[in-house]
């Protein structure tokens, strides 16, 4: 946010965020698929560019414990404030929007929500934005300059007075309850897409927009697999390298935004994947706040770039190769000629793989392996299940080739970028 003018209203900034920010644990391995919303810790999220966080708490006597539903997240609000304030000390040009909500019934004998909150706020008063510090007309939409170095509470609890911005006053899309089947998943996507388009048009009307990419099947997810990770990714498993889940093999005009392969087979589209692609197409110039489960660097950076700035990461094109949609004649796996990655820029921390398909295909449906051409011996696989915007460890070799592609109907190009700080 350091490169954004201080006079910019919060409503005019595109802000990456997380839903269920501290939801890192299930009560046991049995419910983790349902309960968990994130893999990154709070500090990792902040350092990745997240600036909206969603804090759910339970009152325990005179303190807040972090909860998701009835599941304890093995942290307390003091931990949250310690990490957030340290981040703001290290990055004083930033601001953190923090939704604060009572998640479950309090422990017997606990203080009121407001009493507990004030205990935390009073100790750390200089790091909480005070709505009384700006004119009444600006209290629901302050400028970035007013809030730099501060936590802005998006108040989702009742109290005698307002300690931040009224959460219920935001323009919110939060269709979080999702049934089974492609129609339900697609309805969630349309809600996201419509809200993005509305935000893009109305971002300067003084209203802060919040778009939840998150969703769940709730308890029914144990039967229908509509877990938060599936809603986010549309994939067959929680593994980030897994393939998109197939809906049906025959061609159809239904679910038109969902990805298809060359035979017309239709796959589920994850909200994060579809959202990232829409943001990268260029029609959306402003997103408001996006709260996602399991956001990756592609989504986070796509939101940040809408502000006309970039994250601290740099992408340097180091190689590219054209591949056929299936193995070359006489080849078992190989679908391209050899290409090399033989020189990595200083500071390279990983590689990013970008798929540029033909007009008939979608990058999100294509995946492939990368193999090494071994002159005297059996070719080996360096990377498996590479998909659009996958990130991998960086290894050099002069004889890589694309192998075993799926999901493409014709030639596609693979661009390889070195990611540096």
Roles of regions detected by a PLM:
Residues 122, 128-280:
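Surface-exposed substrate-engagement region within the catalytic domains
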Residues 1-48, 61-90, 95, 161-165, ...:
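Long, acidic (Asp/Glu-rich), low-complexity accessory segments flanking structured domains
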Residues 411-421:
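Short, structured beta-strand segments at or near domain termini in extracellular proteins/domains
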Residues 135, 324-346, 360-363:
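Surface-exposed ligand/attachment interfaces on beta-rich extracellular proteins
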Residues 382-394:
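Beta-sandwich interaction modules
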Residues 359-377:
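Short, surface-exposed beta-strand/strand-loop-strand elements in extracellular ectodomains
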Residues 393-407, 412:
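Noncatalytic modules at the cell exterior or secretory-pathway interfaces
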Residues 56, 98, 153, 290:
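Conserved, mostly hydrophobic/aromatic
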